Each structure stands twice: as structure tokens, then as C-alpha cells.
Amino acid sequence: MAKEKFERTKPHVNIGTIGHIDHGKTTLTAAITKHAALRGFGKFVAFDEIDKAPEERERGITISTAHVEYETAKRHYAHVDCPGHADYIKNMITGAAQMDGAILVVSADDGPMPQTREHILLARQVGVPSIVVFLNKCDMVDDEELIELVEMELQELLTKYEFPGDDTPIVRGSALKALEADTSDDPAAEPILKLLDVLDEYVKEPVRDTDKDFLMPIEDVFSISGRGTVVTGRIDRGIIKTGEEVELVGIRDTTKTICTGVEMFRKLLDEGRAGDNVGLLLRGTKRDAVERGQVVAKPGTITPHTKFKAEIYCLSKEEGGRHTPFFSGYRPQFFFRTTDVTGVLSLPEGVEMIMPGDNAAITAELIAPIAMEKELRFAIREGGRTVGAGVIGEIIE
């Protein structure tokens, strides 16, 4: 049997299940793959296969994540599901699995629980653009009014964290009953098919990396006699064409220059695109005026800052993190893109310390400015060893 070729004819969207433990995230994931497969879109992945998700390491942090894929008539979805609550937190903070949208699974007989709230907050902090709700275990609740109360509570909770609560689609069903249904005509399967339609309609297609504003973190700087200064790195997003104006942002004062050449594997190109490892020739720029840790970007699209708020996860001792807690005034290095910058970290009022394995909202101030924006990921390091991971929630100055 020949291996089937991945046809990229449909738009691709990354999705994930979030929500409180035992509310049915993994059962729902299995049910979706089953009914997508019954319609000829992808293959069924059983509950047990998803539940024993392999461990992955992302920036030194161990995360268990299950990846499944399925299609609808309109789209191809890559879907992540995490077995444990801690895995979700790590996943969202490190950006190991970027989500264009999330399915919030809430059990109708429990209603919103602490992790429901925490996952919504995290989704807001790390920039998940949209959430749809699957109200699970509706077969266990006889009282229509109770279900409506849970829905109202969810709408309020979503609105509180700046999602459009009143416009958020809520699909009622039972993931287990759907998983047990063997045909798509079975009434129990209907909510799953409806959920897939809702994903198609409500979750927006992501902007492709090549359509975003150009940005490349500088990894290295060379001086080529007779040609000038070349900076190398992997283009993070956007497209750079020869002759375009760029800005050098971070660490020093922002300067403008012209990119006079794009090279890849020693060949000259007309343009470099997101994902390419390239060398950019910069007009009139001295070798010592640029350094690793700066970014080359489309002018006016990113600014340097030193002070920000972030959501961080502190590695546990088992993950190779610290053995002891840290307090306000802690001075680690913050690793942004390609470089470490020392900074001082402050904890929110009422939080005395952060223990290894905890996550927390913090404020940090760096000793040198870095090109930054909301949702930028970073690592927290001590002498080259990663002790935490974070994502910027808000820029202060």
C-alpha cells in the first residue's frame, strides 16, 4: 500500500481541547476523530491512544501532548489534547502547541470549575484567538434550567476574560455517547458534527507567517570585505526583498538601513521568506553596530522595551529546574529569541514566592531593551540552565 501523500488543498488550522480534569476532553477528541473518519476524513484514534500521550521536551520542559488530525469538508485540523492539567499550563506558556482556536469542554453536571477558569485565563494571556464551548455530559442532567444556568455562567466567565461570551457558540452533547455511536446518522453523533461545523464557521483561519510583517532575530554578524556587514538568522515571519528598508531593534538605539542582498547557502536570492535561514547584507552598517539578540524588522512594526508583565511556569526539580523557591527581586537571565538579558522579577501582591512546578503572573524589568510584543515567548535561565518559561501578557514600557 503506497503511503498517502499529504494533500495541502484545504486550509490548515491548529485547534486544541481545554477544560477541567475529567470533564471529557480526551473522550471528545476521540469522538471527533471517529466521526470525521466515518465521513472519510482521517482516521479514528481511540481514547487509550490519546490518553497515553508521549512526553515531549520543549525548551527543556517535559510535556505530554497527544496530536491527532482530522478534516472537515472545508479544512484540515491538527488537534492537541493534554492528559494532565500541568501539561496544559506548560503547553500554553511555552507555545509548544500553538492554537488558532480552542474547544473548551465543560461538564454540564459540574459547570465551570477552577481549571475551567484557569484555562480561559491562560488562553487570554497567551493569545488564543477564539474559544468554542462543548457542553459535555448533557445526558446526565435532566433539568433544562440547570443546563441554561451553566451556559450563562460560562458566558459570564468568558466575558470576564475578554472573550465575546454572549457570541461564543455552545454545543450541547455527550462525548461518550457519541464515541459509542457507530454511525454518523446516530442522534448521539449529531453534536460532534455540529461542533465541527461550528469550528469551520467560528474559528478564523490563521494569518500565514509569510503574510505577517517581516522579522528576523539576529544569530550572527559577519563582515565581508568589499561587501559590508552580513547578519544571519532564521526568518521568523514575513518576506524580505532586496532593496527594502529595515530597522535594527533591541539592545541599542533603533537604526534604519537598507537590505542590499539576501543570501541562502551562498546563493543570492531576490527574497527570503518565513522559515528560511538566510544572510542579509546591510548597507552602510558597521560590524560593531549590530549584535546577536537584535532583530531585523520591517520599519515601525516592533519596538524595544524593558518592562513587561508575563505569565511564567517555573520548572520542577524533576525537570532540572530549581530546588528552592524564588522571591520578588530574583535576578535571572531572560532568554528572548537568540540572547540572554538580565532582569529583575517581581511577584504580584500577596504572592510571597514561586515554588518549582508553579505558574504565576509576574512583572519583569530588563537591564537592556529587547524588541518585544504581546505573546512573545521567553525562557528564564540561571547560568545557562533553563529554570522557567514565560509568555508576555502586557508591555509596560
UniProtKB/Swiss-Prot annotation:
**Binding sites annotated in the UniProt record for GTP:** 19-26, 81-85, 136-139
Q: Which residues cross the membrane?
A: none
Where are the residues of the annotated region G4?
136-139
Entries under PROSITE patterns matching the protein: G_TR_1, G_TR_2
Where is region (G1) located? 19-26
Enumerate the residue ranges of region (G2).
60-64
Q: How does it assemble?
A: Monomer.
User: What's this protein's name?
Assistant: Elongation factor Tu
State the organism named in the record: Desulforapulum autotrophicum (strain ATCC 43914 / DSM 3382 / VKM B-1955 / HRM2)
